[in-house]
Amino acid sequence: DHQIPSEEFDVKGVLSAKAARIVPKALYVARVTRYDILWTVNMLAREVTRWSAACDRRLHRLICYMHQTSEHAQINFVGDAPSECWLTLFSDASFAGDLRDSKSTSGGILCLVGPNTYVPICWICKKQGAVSHSTAEAEVISLDAGVRLEGLPALSLWSLVIDVFEPEAKPKQPKLELSLHERLLLRRQAHDIFGSVDFVPPSLPICYGRGKLFILEDNDSVIKMIVKGRSPNLRHVGRTHRVDLDWLFERINNDPACFVKWVGTKEQLGDILTK
């Protein structure tokens, strides 16, 4: 964007009439397989109703990049049992990356990892709704979105997969007895989703405890805030950011299946989804 002449942002683009047909196709590709172009496509999608000559230049660059990398393939491999695999969430953020309103961008990618397994499952790229005061605040918001929208739902599903396909390895756990109404509701939901209710047990464990979620963050300050919780020194943190921080502290520290670890910037896979 810094290399695009400023006057092009105020001139209507040549492709303004076709942008609404081109961008959704690129967005579909980015959501299904090409997570490396998701940030660019999201940026173009926000400009569909106000398409400018600068957007023409961005779209041309995107099409050229996709053409040059059309023969590249994503290599995935699975060689382990479900109980031997774990989930890894890479979370990152670009501080004040938007030139118009100085808002940051959240990015994250969730992978299934094992000794002989590596499969990217889903990814997210989202512009934050509030302006952050620092990189740490922006990454807290990104981490909250990744854990809430990707990490925890996938952890629940993967724990269920392990229990269904490897029931003989299931450890003994305390049971939570359900009422008749709760059992009927679970069976109805299972029938709607899977078309069968055979796998629904008469009682559910309090927590499966076999699936694990490793959250990888490249900012030491964010990790310390999550592990120690919010302190009075963070008085400048806004209400929304404060709720996100408290929720992460409570969720990660009280859940034995969630772990936060540091990862180097070069190994941070979520970086490509933020810029």
Predicted regions: what they are:
Residues 47-50, 129-275:
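RNase H-like nuclease module associated with reverse transcription
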Residues 15, 26-27, 74-78, 95-99, ...:
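Generic recognition of flexible, low-complexity loop/linker segments
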